[in-house]
Amino acid sequence: RDDIAQRRAMLLVDEVGGHERILAQFALCPGEDPTYHHIEDGAWPEDVPYATIHRLASAGHVGGIGRLCVQWCLQQGLPVRADTHADNTYMQHTLKACGFVRCGTIYTEDGTPRWAYYHYAI
């Protein structure tokens, strides 16, 4: 709900048989993310304003939808950071395919480790 209230929730939809269907949802959050202040086993390549991709989820109707969402984020004019679990190979593949580089490990508020990725502004 916070993503909606702050106008950062995004939906990717299409139309089939005259009805819209949700293909994916994600949040693009501009500004500093406190979770990213400390990074281990690496470093962020630059210290500039950025946006973060959070909560990317596909409905599973169409292949490659995660990549389309990430590519849209990259077109918004800011460097982009993202993170994912070590076992989320789908997201790791999507980020790498879109040109992200792994920069190290960050930890969520509850201490969960996440692989951290970065893409320069395009």
PLM features per residue range, with description:
Residues 52, 75-87:
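Conserved GNAT acetyl-CoA-binding A-motif
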Residues 27-61:
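Conserved acyl-donor/pantetheine-binding loop and adjacent beta-alpha core of acyl/acetyltransferases
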Residues 45-46, 108-122:
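C-terminal "cap" of GNAT-fold acetyltransferases
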Residues 19-24, 90:
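Glycine-rich acetyl-CoA-binding "A-motif" of GNAT/NAT acetyltransferases
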Residues 8-13, 25, 55, 114-116:
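Short hydrophobic/aromatic beta-strand element in the GNAT-like acyltransferase core
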Residues 1-10, 17:
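Active-site rim helix/loop that mediates acceptor-substrate recognition in acyltransferases
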Residues 58-75, 92-97:
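Conserved acetyl-CoA-binding loop-helix of GNAT-fold acetyltransferases
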Residues 67, 86-105, 112:
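Conserved active-site alpha-helix within GNAT-family acetyltransferase domains
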